[in-house]
Amino acid sequence: GVISRIRREAFIRPWLKKGYSRRLANLYYKKVRADLQEDNGVSAADKKWAHSLGYLSDSIEKYDLKNTPGKYISDVDYMYLKPFNNSFTKWVGDLVTENRVLINHREHLPELYFNIIEREEKKVFLPIDTVDRKFGENYDDFIRLLDERGELVIRPDRTSANRCAYVIKRTGEDRYELKEDTACKARMSIFGNQYDAAYLLSDYPDDLPEDFEKNPCKREYYDKNSLYELISTFKYGYVIAEPYKISGEPCLLRIYAANEKLKETKLLDYYCTDLDGENVRCRAVTPSGELDGRKIGCWDEIIKTVTGIAGYISEIEYFTVSIMLTEGGFVIDSIDTNPDLPPIAHSDALNSFLLDRLEKKRETVVVTREKWWTAFKDKRFKRFVRRCCRPGIRPYMQKLWMSSVWDDFRHNKGTTLSQKLWCYKRGFLSFRIKQYGLTKDNYKSFLSDYQYHW
């Protein structure tokens, strides 16, 4: 309503004057509203005080703000620095691509066997090893490998908050069962996500949401065919991998790394996160690998591997590496190129790096009247695209299509206005009339520009 918009404008106006974008100010306003509604034991007065400095209320205890205000980078400034890095990071996060790119460190990556993708509405098993194909190249070969190994893991091809991994265990002749993947459950619990949200391992609760879709292929055990039917219901990409052999209680080591000027690698911060009962526990790790007075096993090898990976992908300026300790050493569980800050106070080295980066960005990002006018026109154009473009196409493709239409409308002088509108309505650019010889009778036999964009 009008009153809520007035409140929002009153809140974001001071932040706009400080040079933050409207998009960032609105995002911070949403976080502040959620923070005010959360009952975390912090008084409303302290919350408002922290918000005025650019921090959320959990940072008061985290950074001891009462005694050290302004020492650590604020939450709003960290949001201002995001997104980190550039287009070089597109491949990071995909397990299959990481397995191919980081070939010199494959012994510390998850061991993958098959990549499961969807083609023509069917799940297809492709070999990770496309050269020797020693584990096979189809679903039958996966079953053969499963019978040989006894158990394998089916996991999302990238870390997900909604999708989880399962252990597929052979329990008899042509009999397989889904089991809990300890590593995935620990990972998702640490980040506050629900494991087995599809309830494939447990009974459905009584308070299921109305829009919840029950999996029709759920069973207590599966044969070869029913297992394939179950896997076919999984959305997006999955991989078949070797289960982690976790040593003791699962924990997640996270190391913050930075590459300066494509040549110097710095490890900035280290911490360990695990579960203490149902509570998430986070502890700092020293640069020498000491945790609660004891040195972490394989620490020197961990540092060597992380430094080697960071140097190999030196185009990526700032990222974190998540590591799980196993019986045989360790495995690099994931790489995050847009990480959040640690849940505990971060190190001085990481803080100095972020503050220096913040100062450089403020020097280079200058909001001029021309930039403001360009942003205003882009916003108006996006609104026009949403209203005029047909649904069923991704927003960035809508923008490409409408940009093509606008360019054709302005520069193609060989067609009349009515011909242009006729073409646009049917998904063609107007110059196709002469190129294809378009008529009302034959235009459906050609692939339209709109369909090509889609």
Question: Where are the model-predicted features located?
Answer:
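A structural signal for short, well-ordered beta-strand segments and their strand-loop junctions
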Residues: 91, 108-114, 152-156, 167, ...
